[in-house]
Structures are given as structure tokens and as C-alpha cells.
Amino acid sequence: MRITPPFGYEEVVPFLKTQKVCLLAAREVPGFAQRSNAIPISHTEFQLVAREYPIVFTGGDGKTFAPVAVLGLTAGENLFFAGGAWAPGVYVPAYARRYPFCMAKVTLDKAQQKDRLICIEKAFVDEQRGEAMFDAKGQPGAKWVEIERLLSEYEGDLERSREMCSIVADYGLLEPFTMQATLAKEKGGAAMHVTGMHRVSEKKLEDLNAAQLKNLLRKGVMARIYMHLLSLENFARLLERKAARPAAS
């Protein structure tokens, strides 16, 4: 059996009821997110994410896309990571809140299984310092009930995200773009170019036929398109966060 770790995870193993786990503190930032300038988001998160973060679409093959929240303006930079935790008053994406757990793809006998498996980052399994998620009778504790609900709801929401991205891509609505900005001279005057992003083209959106527009509305995609477009204004807020940091950072 081979388990494919999701983005940001190093080595994941199947989660067992008997394992003891080291959980992250509230608003603690997973190691991978401290060093990432983007993080995946899901369908129902758009409204909350759009308040603080730019939402863009990324796709390595140019055909399959996924929505992400932009966290920084340079590689390895999370401008919402401050004082060892997520910045106060800012929504924490579910992708970070579920860590160190995940739902991972499993390959068995060279065939990828349809169902995903609840897994955990191996480094967070600790029989000495960890805490049990189930009692001696195998009954789930309150924390595990909450974690399992998050995992289940998030996984279901990802399916809606994949459907949304498939529709947007099939309609040819996405176009690549680059965010360019320059810091003030007193902050070093560095020029920044954020690439690898796609956004919905308003011109292409206007060219859709009535049936396509109706489908976007029926599927709840149109609302998310507008949230995405409005969220792009948050690049200016990212630049403000960048400028507010000491020049040495």
C-alpha cells in the first residue's frame, strides 16, 4: 500500500484508534504553512477567505485547477504568520486547521483507491507526549469528534471545489496573470513578481451563453467567481502587511 501525502505533508500513515497524537495549539501555524505563500481552500470557504486573502487559481498542467489563498508575495513567505501563530482576527483556512490529520489517496496493487483514508503526519504520533483520541473502550473523545467532522466536511467540500474548477476550466474562463509591486524605498524598494496564478476573465465571462450562465448560477459558481474577483483587491493589503514588517525580514 502506498499513501500519497497531500501538499505540505511529509510522511503520513493511517490513523489508528490506539495512537496518541500531538495536536497543534489553537491558531498554531503548521510548519509547511509558515514557509508557504499560498494554501488550498475549499468551496464554502470563499466568503471568509475573500475578506483577508486574495483568492487565485493554480494549475500545474494548465487543465486542472484548484483555488488557493495567497499568503505572501515572495516564495516561502506567509505574511499572516506572526509571533508563532496565525495573525489575530484573521480566518485560518481549514487546510491548516485539520493538520496533522488529512484524508489521503491510497494506491493498492498499483491501483488508486476511490475512497480516501484518514491519515496523520507520522512525526505527530507520540506515545509518550501525545493524547489519546479514543478511550480504552474504543469510544471517540470530544476532540476526535470535532476533528473527524472537520475532515469529513472538508473532504466533501473539496469535491464541490473540484466540480467548480472543472466547470470554470471547461468554459475557458481562466487566464494567467502576474502581480507586480514595488516596496517603498525606505523598505528596500524591492520589486516583486508573483506568477503561476490564474484569474477569471470578466471579458470571457460576458461572452458565455445563457445556458452556461444559468449553470454557473445553479451550481453556486457565479457567486464564488465574484468573491474571487473582489478578493484580488487584497493584494494591496498583502503589500501593506509586507511593508509593515521590519526590512530585515
What residue spans do the PLM features occupy?
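A short, compositionally biased
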Residues: 49-52, 97-98, 173-178
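Aromatic- and glycine-enriched beta-alpha-beta binding-site module
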Residues: 58, 66-136
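A contiguous, surface-oriented mixed alpha/beta subdomain in the mid-to-C-terminal portion of proteins
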Residues: 103-249
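Short linear motifs in intrinsically disordered
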Residues: 43-48, 92-94, 107, 169-170
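Short, well-structured alpha-helical interface segments that form or flank functional binding sites
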Residues: 50, 91-94, 159, 200
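Short, basic/low-complexity N-terminal boundary segments at the transition from targeting/disordered tails
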Residues: 31-34, 74-79, 157-163
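Short, extreme N-terminal leader segments that mark the start of a protein/domain
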Residues: 1-71
